[in-house]
Amino acid sequence: MFKKTLSMICCVIFLQGCSQEQEVKKEMTSMETALLAATEKQETNTVILLLKKGADTNITDSKGRTPLMIATYKNDVKTAKALIEAGADVNIQDDMKNNPFLYAGAEGYFDILKLTIDAGADPSLTNRYGGTALIPASEHGYIDVIKELLTRTTIDVNHVNNLGWTALMEAIVLSNGNETQQQVIQLLIEHGADVNIPDNDGVTPLEHARAHNFEEIEKILLATNK
């Protein structure tokens, strides 16, 4: 009889423990859902409150986006800063293979880029095209972003993406050759860009510059090869 009673007591205690654990998990899930929603709405104060209550900074939504990734997509610097200060992982990539560092570099979101670098972003991670943050930044002519990447990270200036393009190549092929792009080319070369790396078809940056009639860029490339 005693053993049976003891067994029943243990069972009740176990079930109570399970119930409490389930309640905690339910509460945490609710907080994480609220955190994602608050980030989406750019409600920074609510985000901060939820973080103080213990919400998981690295929870992901149905698209694999963390709250920090959502804030980055919206260029919401204030919320991004709060999330990073709370320990958000800046290297987590979503289903599109974007992460805060990669996307901020590609879109020219300078302030968020700096925050991710300060938080230990991995510059070797690549996007869905196999490119580093430097490649799209060079295409778009984001001078400040390019300088930040080249001077504050160990990013590979000669990394080749899936198309066979380096940052230098992309800055030629996908640009209009204006003064900003000329500055980009010069900046990349000053930081070790190899002007002779061809694309997957064996076409060099110089040949592409000539094909686009980018005379000033052609001069820069020729001067580098002297």
Per-segment meaning from a language model:
Residues 195-226:
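Leucine-rich solenoid repeat scaffolds
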Residues 37-42, 70-76, 103-109, 136-142, ...:
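Ankyrin repeat A-helix N-terminal signature
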Residues 43-51, 76-84, 109-118, 142-151, ...:
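Ankyrin repeat structural motif
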Residues 16-17:
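C-terminal motif of bacterial Sec signal peptides marking the signal peptidase cleavage site
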Residues 22-70:
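N-terminal segments that cap or nucleate solenoid repeat domains
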